[in-house]
Amino acid sequence: MTNESEVGVKKAAELLRQGATMLEEACPICKMPLFKLKNGDVVCPVHGKVYIVKSDDEEKIVKRNLQLDEIESILIDGLYLSAKKMKEDPLDSERIIQIIRYLDALERLRKIKINSSE
């Protein structure tokens, strides 16, 4: 057994001990069985959260949501770095404008996410 599969088996055993249910579907990447947690999430013991889609339209929606989440994460990281740099010079007008732009972009992104989920 390879090291990765040993780790996967140990994590799978831990998921079962925690009350997860083993599903008949397998991870498309590593072929390990998928597990359904008590909260309803489906996870691979090796790769973490997995999204099961039943149609091309559903796949597009999931991919779009993942991309929006990634963009949101990038914006939050940029906002955090700008705020951290602003501590050095609180009167830096360029930095203030940059923070406002990050906040505006985050607000727009969240509106897009809300509208797409309706």
UniProtKB/Swiss-Prot annotation:
* Secretion signal span: none
Q: Which InterPro entries match?
A: SSSCA1, UPF0148
Which HAMAP family does the entry mention?
UPF0148
Q: Report the family membership.
A: Belongs to the UPF0148 family.
NCBIfam families this protein is in? Answer: PRK00420.1-1, PRK00420.1-4
**Entry protein name:** UPF0148 protein SSO0781
